[in-house]
Regions:
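A hydrophobic alpha-helical transmembrane-helix feature that marks the membrane cores
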Residues: 1-231
Length: 231
């Protein structure tokens, strides 16, 4: 079985592609640019949520529809990107990513106002290092990450349930943060490898970038949580 055949049950088009294939360099540049766009959206969202006008919206309850709408639109964007990768539709994939990146970035930015700039910078550097290391490991040891992917997903669900219980008990969740970091670091390795096995088309680059963006953001936010408790 070749590398691509292992993912034929997913949304990626592995047969005749409707979208034009790019060079590997262009494919990687597009993914990097899209991930950067996602972080930029998060930065804009962090600025917006730190303003007094947003604070007044939160106090009045007017921001709740915005939060709920962002969550719904994030799901809509993900569905659009998955459908676009299946159909190899360039336009649908780009629209889906714009919706996903802007709304998910806004939602993820809500907690940034609780941290100072040095803490955010430290978390960003640590996240970049983890992304580089596990991305390289994912390409070097793909079979390992394929084997542990399902296990990691199960651990993630169990950890989230434990966190809900600990939240009501008022117990520190540093250990669960570390577990989630390890799990999503593994996802970075897995998704990086998958990105190298699919046809290098724009719709595939968009979907792969969104997967990696979610992985990276979760690592980043969990590191922020840990560093914030130490301040």
């Amino acid at each position: 079985m070749n590398d691509i055949q292992g993912y034929q049950n997913g949304p990626i088009e592995t047969g005749a592609s409707r979208a034009k294939e790019m060079s590997p360099r262009a494919y990687n540049l597009v993914m990097s640019a899209l991930i950067f766009l996602g972080f930029s959206a998060m930065g804009v969202g962090a600025y917006f949520t730190s303003t007094m006008s947003f604070a007044r919206m939160m106090m009045s309850g007017a921001a709740l529809p915005l939060v709920f709408g962002s969550f719904i639109l994030t799901i809509v964007g993900m569905v659009m990107m998955s459908a676009a990768a299946s159909k190899q539709s360039v336009g649908l994939s780009l629209v889906g990513y714009v919706i996903f990146a802007s709304t998910f970035g806004l939602t993820a930015s809500f907690g940034l106002a609780n941290y100072d700039l040095p803490t955010i910078n430290t978390a960003f550097i640590a996240t970049a290092a983890i992304t580089f290391v596990f991305g390289a490991l994912g390409v070097t040891f793909p079979k390992f990450f394929q084997r542990v992917y399902g296990i990691g997903f199960g651990i993630l669900l169990a950890t989230i349930l434990v966190e809900i219980v600990l939240m009501f008990m008022g117990v520190s969740q540093t250990i669960t943060d570390l577990i989630v970091i390890v799990v999503f670091a593994g996802f970075i390795g897995y998704d990086t490898y998958v990105a190298t096995t699919v046809p290098p088309t724009l719709p595939n680059a968009v979907l792969m970038a969104s997967n990696l963006f979610v992985d990276i953001i979760n690592v980043f936010l969990r590191i922020l949580n840990i560093l914030g408790r130490r301040d």
